[in-house]
Swiss-Prot record:
Coiled-coil spans in chain: none
Methyltransferase in keyword set: no
Designated gene of the protein: uxaC
Domain of life according to the entry: Bacteria
Species whose genome carries this gene: Vibrio vulnificus (strain CMCP6)
Keywords (A to Z) from UniProt: Isomerase
Catalytic activity: D-glucuronate = D-fructuronate; aldehydo-D-galacturonate = keto-D-tagaturonate
Entries under PANTHER family matching the protein: URONATE ISOMERASE (PTHR30068:SF4)
Keyword Transport: no
Identification of the protein by name: Uronate isomerase
Amino acid sequence: MKNFLCEDFLLSNETARRLYHEHACHQPIYDYHCHLNPAEVAQNRQFDNLGQIWLEGDHYKWRGMRSAGIEERLITGDASDYDKYMAWAKTVPQTLGNPLYHWTHLELRRPFGITNTLFSPDTADQIWHQCNELLATPEFTARGIMQQMNVVMAGTTDDPIDSLKHHKTIAEDDTFNVKVLPSWRPDKAFKIELDLFADYMHKLGEVADIEIRRFDDLLSALDKRLAHFDAHGCRAADHGIEIVRYAPIPSEADLDVLLARRLNGEVLSELECAQFSTAVQVWLGKRYAQLGWVMQLHIGAQRNNSTRMFQLLGADAGFDSIGDRPFAFELAHLLDEMDQTNELPRTILYCLNPRDNEMMATMIGNFQGGGIAGKVQFGSGWWFNDQKDGMQRQMEQLSQLGLLSQFVGMLTDSRSFLSYTRHEYFRRILCDMVGRWAENGEVPNDLSLLGPMVEDICFGNAKRYFEERV
């Protein structure tokens, strides 16, 4: 019987163990999509205590605490960091079977070195003091943790109107060897249905020094900001798409009318929203191809389901879930609009509903080519799927319907500096899956064949994919 979280955690056979310990575990981390605050890296934030670094902004933990009956004051309210931390300690023993239990103990092990101690109300004070002592040292600042965890690149998520001043500060500091690069998140520019769309057009116009009145004005403003992002090292865009919209692109004159009506406060029809969204996203995708960027499409979240809590706390507070709208037709046509002129950029497709895994794994095969290995990717298990079953399902379906060997692997998608252990979690699951294939005779039990593939999935593929500007 294995002990909990031993060195061979999640590794069920000898081949898996060798793949992990000899090939996977020492690979650097290329965290190409996250939600870290670049200001905290630029300023090298020193966290005051474990509660602060562990619970600030982590809606995974917040959802678990609510389910365990913790009152909101102890989650997002005005309670002290210590009281929130103790509420989390009360919650963790109730999370058995949930990845939160694994993640919590992995995060204590790395970087804090706490092993053989289960986190609970009984051990919480001891762990609090031990971790707080470490957090007061230079090795446990925001930058120190990234370096300890062997991170070589972190791709943040940034609005086109952002100044990117913090990325500039980081890039100019020769004492810090981790690349922190912006990623372009233009959702507010193509979601014309948003209540604050007109306000956003004004802000975008101010930053770009262009008054946005016509569709061409919008594209000119976006183009100026694309150049700004590119100059600051941006190599990826990310579109958060709750509903995949597609409609044939109307004339520019018609798009001018749609934009003018919306800026005047009119509510557009679903078809008109789809026309505008398609026009902007197709134009953006073609520009990404010209710049050599990667386009990421995160599809299928159903957001802000609780009106009461949205009004109280705003977005990204733990009240989102998996959507179930079909979107294969719209997605295929959206990608095809770019591909028809051979201007589809390298693209990663993520789905939140695992029902869509096989569809997505076959969709990517429609648009491969151009001599680029894995040009269109089926992204790693995202959000509610970045747990053992979800990640394994995604990789198995990719391997059966595409090429696992070209997969760009894991990303944290997190706001926390302690989330890098999710790369370890992913690597163990990957090695166990490939190891089982080998032990069952489904693939050759040849580490000279399997080892390099695992190394590429853990690091090499992502580095090549994001750094080759083609």
